[in-house]
Amino acid sequence: MTYRTSLMLIAIAVCVQLASADSQTERVRALAAKNSAALSSGNYARLVELTYPKIVEMIGGRDKMIETLRRGSEDMKAHGSAILGAEVSEPKEVVTVGDRQFAILPMTVRVRVPDGTLRSTGFLIAVSEDHGKTWTFIDGAGLKEKLAQVLPEFPPQLLLPPREQPVLEPK
C-alpha cells in the first residue's frame, strides 16, 4: 500500500468518525427537543417515556409522575403562568462509560408569568443504554445534590453547568 493510499484511508476513517459523532449529537438533541415539546404541550405521557427510568421510579411510577406534572401545570395556570417553550442545544460531547453514554444539553425555558416572560437557562442530562440508539433525559434543575444517587456512574469529566438566576423580560 502506498503512502498516499494510507493517508487517504486514514482521512476517510476520521471523516466517518466525525460524521458519526455529529449524527449522534444531533440525534440526542432531536430527542431532547421532543422531550421539551412534550412538556410545553402538556403531553405528560410522552414526557414520562423520555424521562430516565430511575427518576420515574423515584417519583412513584408512571401514573404518579403524570399526575404530578398535570397538577403542577394546573397550579401554574391558576397563578397566571404557563410554560411557553423550551429550546435545547446540542451537547458539547458524548461520553461513554461501559455500556452507557452520557451528555449534557444546554436548555432555555420560557415561562409566561403575570409580569412578563421569565427566561431560565438550565440543562438536561441525556443517558443512553443502547449505544446512542435511544436516549432518556433528566432535568438538571436541583440535581447536583442527588446526582450520585440517581446516576452513580455519571462521568466526572462531564461538568454540570452552574445554576443561573432566571431573567424577567417585562411586558
Locate the predicted segments by residue.
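Exposed beta-sheet edge and beta->alpha loop/turn motif
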Residues: K92-K171
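Alpha-helix boundary/capping and short turn/kink residues
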Residues: S41-Y44, P114
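Alpha-helix boundary/capping residues
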Residues: A13, T51-K54, G72, F154-L158
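Bacterial N-terminal signal peptides that target proteins for export
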Residues: M1-M8
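Residue-level signal for secondary-structure boundary elements
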Residues: S40, K77-S81, P162
